[in-house]
Amino acid sequence: MRALLLLAVFLQAQAPAPLPGTDIYLVPLKGGLASMKTATPTPLSTAPGYDNQPFFSADGRRVLFAANHDGKQTDVFVFNRETGRVTQLTTTPENENSPTYLPSGKTDADGFSVVRSEMDKTQRLWRFNATGREPYLLLTDVKPVGYHAWVDPDRVALFILGEPNSLQLASVNSGKSEVVANGIGRSLHRIPGTRAVSFVHREPSGDYWIKQIDADSRKIEPLTKVVDGAADRDMAWMPDGKTILMSGGTKVFSWTRGASSWTEVFDAALHNLGAVSRIAVSPKGDAIAIVVAEPKR
């Protein structure tokens, strides 16, 4: 009996933590960022379970996202903004997260990349074609990958899990990666119009700063402290490459280069929505996707 109890405790400890219940909403920006405060969010995916990690296509017409509705399997879905339809792209025994359109130009024809949790739980960077087929391993020896952001068709910034978590720049062509920072957060983004990537970095003082690294020179520059009370420190860039959005509780704040503080631009609570975590911005700047905590059902 004691052995059975110990086995049960061990198995419980090994079980993965359940994914949070989250929904995705689209917030239209008909009058630029200033119109976000009065905009009405519309549901993109609100099925029971995990709907998260939205990413717009280059033309802004589609939104990739990861979803897990049965508590077991995470796959990639796509929302078509023109038809309002959601289509499942991957159906695999593995888990696919962080779907990201490949930086191929104006269309999504080259497919998308994902962080794939393989059958042995190894997490590496893979790619699929545009219809969610033909999986291909991009970086064989770089692991365990948590999140990623493309700099260009060859170079990719990676959040590598570890003690501490590290920021690495990798080349798909060479298969090699280089550690460029330690102690980073999960929110990685290429800054529009540049070959720089932003990341959240924990200072020795305990403060969290948004910083940028130039992928060519490796120069790192601080930008601003994160929003006070931001639990997950999730952020996104507006298309101008000058303005950052960051979530904090049920609110979204903006910061523009040169500003001394953050400005509130949206409150999900006014629409009876929960706390905001991840944010994605359409390349045209006409819509923002927000991930909110799922209401109790």
Predicted regions and their residues:
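Sequence signature of WD/YWTD-type beta-propeller architectures
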Residues: 13-297
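Sec-dependent N-terminal signal peptides
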Residues: 2-11
